[in-house]
């Protein structure tokens, strides 16, 4: 039984400084991560058709907390702290990096990771580290090459192919697609990917209902 997920009903639950302050490790979580200027907040707002679900900031690096959003029962989106921006003090960068690594390596309910990279500057060192962390934990990764509207169609396709070729080195399940919050490029594909990752939550519901019917 396929379930229609209403992403527009997504709402904020809580913020946490680290994994220990998050709610119980249960259900299914899909995490969004990216450099501080990769357009992560804009992508979340476009995905959910909401203008201010994730707060955008003109000062990259302001999002220092792990933000949790409820999509459906037992389905959550996690907005991880932006990373790697020059204006952020080194100690804070180290703290965020530790927080990211800990979340990816220890959070059992994490079923997929969306990594956002500016299509003009993809695969920076810390982007690659993030993907390797996920692959090491057998977590599937969707790379979104954001701000795709900044390139003409031919250049956009060439860049996607280039990053797809590079992504082979990661091993694991890593997909690469172009994305634009402004023009809506790749939004339907992203929703389809999240539908796939969230699907087991509804299979559990169906099994529970069947058990009740049997009783």
Curated annotation (Swiss-Prot):
SUPFAM superfamilies: P-loop containing nucleoside triphosphate hydrolases
CDD domains (UniProt xref): YihA_EngB
Key words, A-Z: Cell cycle, Cell division, GTP-binding, Magnesium, Metal-binding, Nucleotide-binding, Septation
Entry binding sites for Mg(2+): 41, 63
Superkingdom of the source species: Bacteria
GO biological process: division septum assembly
Function: Necessary for normal cell division and for the maintenance of normal septation.
Protein name as catalogued: Probable GTP-binding protein EngB
Biological classification of the source: Bacteria, Pseudomonadati, Pseudomonadota, Gammaproteobacteria, Vibrionales
